[in-house]
């Protein structure tokens, strides 16, 4: 069973090509393998800090800089998004089908 919070880097209605340049983060709370709630955090000056404040357990993104990887990967698992579809990536995450990013 997955019970955690996940941050997904997004642009409008799809996964962003860049963690650093995304427009916002979608925070998804998953309990018992089901999405229970979502919340949007804009990627402004405090956006990336808000991910930590939200106590997320994982990040889903296409690309992440080495600097941010080092900053976040100590406490948060980082997964590589498959394509642009947000819902599909959430499902893949719940099913354990997304690959962890081990080196940006």
UniProtKB/Swiss-Prot annotation:
InterPro entries: Di-Nase_FeMo-co_biosynth (IPR003731), DiNase_FeMo-co_biosyn_sf (IPR036105), NifX/NifY_domain (IPR051840). Pfam families: Nitro_FeMo-Co. Coiled coil: none annotated. This is Uncharacterized protein MJ0327.
């Amino acid at each position: 069973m997955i019970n955690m919070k996940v941050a997904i880097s997004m642009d409008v209605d799809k996964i962003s090509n860049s963690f650093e340049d995304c427009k916002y983060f979608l925070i998804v709370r998953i309990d018992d393998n089901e999405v229970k709630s979502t919340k949007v955090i804009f990627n402004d000056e405090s956006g990336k800090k808000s991910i930590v404040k939200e106590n997320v357990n994982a990040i889903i993104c296409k690309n992440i800089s080495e600097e941010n990887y080092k900053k976040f990967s100590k406490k948060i698992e980082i997964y590589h998004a498959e394509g642009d579809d947000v819902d599909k990536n959430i499902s893949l995450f719940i099913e354990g089908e997304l690959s962890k990013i081990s080196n940006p």
